[in-house]
């Protein structure tokens, strides 16, 4: 009885005296995490869709759980997702679903700690550094096209799984100096698509029931295999394969010159503090890089190719533009030339914008399109709402999470009219060139000091693949 009374008092305080109690939103969402749990776990990852409806009901800023706000105002994006000296921590509730990912750069809670880890990685994923592996990306793109041709008469296959093969091979080879060789195998299985999706879906459960992660950590693989083959594959990769690759990187160090040195070998030789170079931390860093570098890239490319086939007019227009630039699929132009093609760039942007499928029927689940909360630790944020009479200003107290979702912004009809339609022309100005103003609202890579580290690598792959698929297979 005492514990029940305690819960009742806690919920009452949350909706009356809590610093976020003044913000609009369902009282149940403010009182308890059960509201979020219902839509995330029981309803099957549907909270983002529910949040869209909450904004329609309550306005551009909504309290979505006891300690977190969600906003839907593009003018406020650069305030929350800021760069420079303004500190932004991540939310411990958000990161709880990822377990040991806190040891990776992506999962680092504290702003300054993140800066230390991020600084060590930035140079490896800069545009100039990614250009050094552009030839490798082009070779793998052509290899993928050759494989498409070889398997074209052998029935349907999972397109996202196929793109997962090239994405995983690319990022793993760059980080470790060797890859799983998914493109070299017969067929498209195995690949990382299935177990990555399982892990990402599990995060919504373990965020509320974290002890599941600790149980999975200590259970033997023989038992895990009986529960979930995908989870078993992920743990085998984490516990066995990645440690073997890292060990091989160290043992074969003398075979790599400075230019071709794998990322993790350079990190081992960097000026990071010794505690940041532990094998366990590098395993989590590797998991983060592989998950981010392959899953989202595969989904984006699958979405783009699907829409090019489903919309012959768009495919024909892109094909016409590529004919003037790409004469030989085995000798693709450089990134700098491909990104000058306005319609190709527009197709890529539209593919990134529309890569979230709420039904999960056409495209796999992609967590990068959902909310990414931030916490301002040293300042109060001022939000001015001109759409709600009498409530034109909110003061968001320091220490509480606030964020938005890429999918929510990308579905905003005031920014992207007919948002449910795949329409690359929206990214072009009247002169047929890139609409730079609209590109400011693309949040597929997040923004600010914690924007996606692999952005340039993904962009290079996304630019190369449509050109290769079009010329190498005479596709779309």
From Swiss-Prot:
It comes from the Eukaryota. Keywords: Heme, Iron, Metal-binding, Monooxygenase, Oxidoreductase. Its cofactor is heme. Its EC number is 1.-.-.-. Pathway: Secondary metabolite biosynthesis. Gene3D superfamilies: Cytochrome P450. InterPro entries: Cyt_P450, Cyt_P450_CS, Cyt_P450_E_grp-IV, Cyt_P450_sf, Cytochrome_P450_monoxygenase. The keyword Oxidoreductase applies. Heme binds at residue 452. PROSITE patterns: CYTOCHROME_P450. The keyword Heme applies. GO terms for molecular function: heme binding; iron ion binding; monooxygenase activity; oxidoreductase activity, acting on paired donors, with incorporation or reduction of molecular oxygen. Belongs to the cytochrome P450 family. Cytochrome P450 monooxygenase; part of the gene cluster that mediates the biosynthesis of pyrrolopyrazines, secondary metabolites showing insecticidal activity. The role of ppzE within the pathway has still to be determined. The single multifunctional NRPS ppzA is sufficient to produce peramine via condensation of 1-pyrroline-5-carboxylate and arginine, N-methylation of the alpha-amino group of arginine and reduction of the thioester and the cyclization to form an iminium ion resulting in release from the peptide synthetase. This is Cytochrome P450 monooxygenase ppzE. It comes from Metarhizium majus (strain ARSEF 297). The gene is ppzE.
């Amino acid at each position: 009885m005492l514990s029940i009374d305690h819960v009742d008092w806690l919920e009452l305080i949350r909706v009356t005296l809590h610093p976020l109690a003044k913000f609009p939103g369902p009282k149940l969402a403010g009182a308890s995490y059960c509201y979020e749990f219902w839509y995330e776990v029981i309803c099957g990852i549907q909270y983002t869709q529910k949040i869209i409806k909450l904004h329609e009901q309550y306005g551009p800023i909504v309290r979505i759980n006891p300690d977190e706000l969600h906003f839907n105002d593009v003018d406020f994006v650069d305030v929350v997702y800021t760069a420079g000296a303004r500190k932004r921590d991540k939310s411990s509730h958000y990161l709880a679903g990822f377990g040991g990912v806190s040891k990776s750069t992506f999962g680092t809670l504290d702003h300054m700690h993140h800066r230390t880890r991020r600084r060590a990685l930035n140079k490896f994923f800069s545009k100039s550094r990614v250009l050094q592996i552009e030839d490798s990306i082009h070779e793998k793109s052509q290899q993928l096209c050759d494989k498409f041709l070889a398997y074209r008469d052998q029935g349907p296959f999972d397109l996202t799984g196929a793109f997962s093969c090239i994405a995983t091979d690319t990022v793993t080879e760059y980080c470790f100096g060797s890859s799983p060789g998914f493109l070299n195998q017969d067929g498209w299985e195995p690949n990382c698509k299935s177990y990555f999706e399982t892990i990402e879906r599990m995060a919504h459960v373990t965020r509320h029931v974290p002890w599941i992660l600790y149980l999975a950590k200590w259970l033997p693989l023989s038992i895990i295999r009986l529960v979930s083959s995908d989870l078993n594959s992920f743990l085998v990769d984490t516990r066995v394969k990645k440690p073997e690759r890292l060990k091989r990187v160290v043992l074969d160090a003398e075979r790599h010159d400075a230019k071709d040195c794998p990322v993790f070998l350079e990190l081992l030789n960097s000026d990071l503090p010794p505690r940041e170079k532990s094998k366990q931390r590098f395993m989590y860093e590797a998991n983060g890089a592989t998950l981010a570098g392959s899953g989202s890239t595969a989904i984006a490319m699958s979405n783009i190719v699907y829409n090019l086939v489903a919309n012959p007019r768009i495919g024909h227009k892109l094909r016409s533009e590529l004919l003037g630039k790409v004469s030989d699929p085995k000798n693709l132009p450089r990134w700098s030339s491909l990104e000058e093609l306005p319609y190709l760039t527009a197709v890529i942007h539209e593919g990134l914008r529309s890569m979230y499928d709420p039904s999960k029927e056409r495209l796999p689940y992609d967590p990068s399109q959902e909310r990414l909360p931030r916490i301002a630790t040293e300042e109060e944020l001022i939000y001015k709402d001109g759409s709600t009479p009498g409530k034109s200003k909110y003061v968001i107290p320091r220490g509480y999470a606030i964020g938005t979702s890429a999918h929510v912004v990308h579905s905003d009809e005031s920014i992207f009219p007919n948002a449910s339609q795949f329409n690359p022309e929206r990214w072009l100005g009247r002169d047929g060139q890139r609409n730079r103003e609209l590109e400011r609202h693309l949040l597929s890579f997040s923004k600010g000091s914690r924007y996606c580290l692999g952005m340039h690598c993904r962009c290079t792959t996304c630019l190369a693949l449509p050109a290769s698929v079009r010329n190498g297979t005479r596709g779309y």
